[in-house]
Amino acid sequence: MIVAFVSGNCSIGKTTVACNLAYLLKDTFDVSFFDCDIEKTDATVFLPSKWIEEKEIVISVPKIDRSQCNHCLNCVRICQFGVFLDFKNTIITLPERCAGCGYCSSFCTRHAIDYKPFVLGTIKKGSYKNLTVIESRINSTAVKADSLLFNTHSLLNPLGLNVVDCAPLISEYHFCSALDPDFFVIVTNGSFVEIKNFLAIVQQIQEMNRPFGIVINKAKTEKSFIEDYCQNNNLPILGILPFEEDVVSGKTSAYKLVTYSDKWQALYKNLWQRILEEVSQ
């Protein structure tokens, strides 16, 4: 089973919620935690892992043999990722945009396109207590994460529970959606300012025809705008996690919330039960 955690903004507490659920279930299931917040991997702050494997993901990106290039512009026209630029009658390549498909060279009549290696990112595999932890981190200059995704996908445990912490913001959701999650957990703080991104996430997941539910994190005592919206539009609320000063100020380690008090453990147990209920429908 694959459960993906997504959010519309940074600093919502998505990683905290995902890590706590994985930590709660580590002794009950064979849990693998995937930190797929590829531009800003930070789950190890909560799950300080001992790494046992590290793999560089290398793709082949084009380079131009200028002695052979006749400036036909076939490469510029055929590449949908904008790797090739025509600048003052010279073809410039942007390797950080490349997906490594190799399509461009088949359209070069002069055989002027060769390839060179480019480090797209790294994948680390380790453990923390009973958890398997995988971290996917993209090169800071890279734009396309496809090959990083394919290599991450191969590490999913088909017989266990895979908890995936996705990158915030809609532009990155293709990365986690391509992992084909069984269930999406949308983490929100319930505020009005987040409604635009929240609605866009809901629409994308509905178009994928995947079950999902909403967790309202850092909830205040009064009813939030998004809570009202969910109830009025029959969107399932999985849980409401309260705002507590001790948690926000760091007086308790975030990954130990499920052991911090019986109250927090019960909240996360209820969250897991609600996920199972929604998946089974």
Model-derived features with residue positions:
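Short beta-strand-centered segment that lines the nucleotide-binding/catalytic pocket of NTP-utilizing
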Residues: 29-44, 117-123
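Walker A (P-loop) phosphate-binding motif
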Residues: 1-26
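C-terminal lobe/tail of nucleotide-utilizing enzymes
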Residues: 3, 204-281
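Inter-motif core of Ras-like GTPase G domains
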Residues: 171-192, 198
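Iron-sulfur cluster-binding cysteine motifs and their immediate structural context
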Residues: 74-92, 103-119
